[in-house]
């Protein structure tokens, strides 16, 4: 619907705006909480309206690298459950997780769907297996989600319409043999540490 709103959190992957606005909906952006890049819940709650249909979140985040904590996700889920009751309709979380494995120093990346039933999980192998541009991944639609049949049908329909992003059959076969194998992120971690230390040495302040 023209008045539908999707909320996301700054900083965010720029194409989110294209995805949302191409449907005629509006992207609403919660300003960044720069001291730790967790969610500014006061700002978030001010932006929620009866037109809010979904929240797009990305953890580990592109471009900040921040990982939303379990406490952050629990609070987000609690607020959205209250708003679902108040507004009388589902508010989905679209959890975009292409960087799930790329977390360092023992950081745990919580599974959002563990805390909130109305969660769609979008995963891509482009980062974990270094396959950018190959358009191979999946969307998890839990049985518990509101309007399951309608949501599942809409996603399946989108895959048929957007033929330029359909998963190539060759990569589907290849990934079936690779799924579940650990990703070697040592090079990413080393490069990240070098960049971080370089910025600190140059006088910058960085959140880590």
Where are these regions (language model features)?
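Conserved PLP-anchoring active-site segment centered on the Schiff-base-forming lysine
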Residues: 1-19
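Short, intrinsically disordered, charge-balanced linker/junction segments flanking boundaries
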Residues: 1-3, 49-50, 194-208
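Short beta->alpha connector loops at strand-helix junctions that form conserved
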Residues: 10, 29-34
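A short helix-loop-beta submotif of the ANL/AMP-binding
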Residues: 21-27
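Active-site phosphate-binding strand-loop segment of PLP-dependent enzymes
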Residues: 34-107
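Conserved core segment of the aminotransferase class I/II
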Residues: 117-189, 193-204
């Amino acid at each position: 619907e023209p008045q539908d709103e999707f909320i996301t959190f700054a900083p965010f992957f720029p194409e989110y705006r294209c995805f949302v606005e191409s449907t005629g909906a509006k992207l609403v952006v919660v300003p960044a909480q720069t001291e730790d890049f967790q969610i500014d819940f006061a700002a978030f709650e001010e932006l929620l309206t009866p037109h809010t249909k979904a929240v797009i979140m990305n953890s580990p985040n592109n471009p900040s690298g921040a990982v939303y904590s379990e406490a952050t996700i629990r609070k987000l889920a609690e607020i959205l459950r209250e708003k679902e009751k108040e507004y009388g309709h589902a508010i989905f979380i679209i959890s975009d997780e292409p960087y799930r494995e790329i977390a360092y120093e023992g950081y745990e990346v919580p599974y959002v769907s563990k805390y909130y039933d109305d969660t769609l999980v979008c995963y891509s192998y482009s980062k974990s297996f270094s396959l950018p541009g190959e358009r191979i991944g999946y969307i998890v639609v839990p049985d518990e989600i509101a309007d399951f049949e309608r949501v599942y049908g809409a996603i399946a329909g989108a895959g048929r319409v957007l033929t330029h992003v359909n998963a190539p059959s060759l990569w589907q076969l290849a990934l079936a043999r690779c799924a579940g194998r650990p990703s070697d992120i040592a090079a990413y971690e080393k490069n990240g540490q070098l960049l971080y230390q370089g910025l600190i040495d140059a006088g910058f302040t960085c959140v880590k």
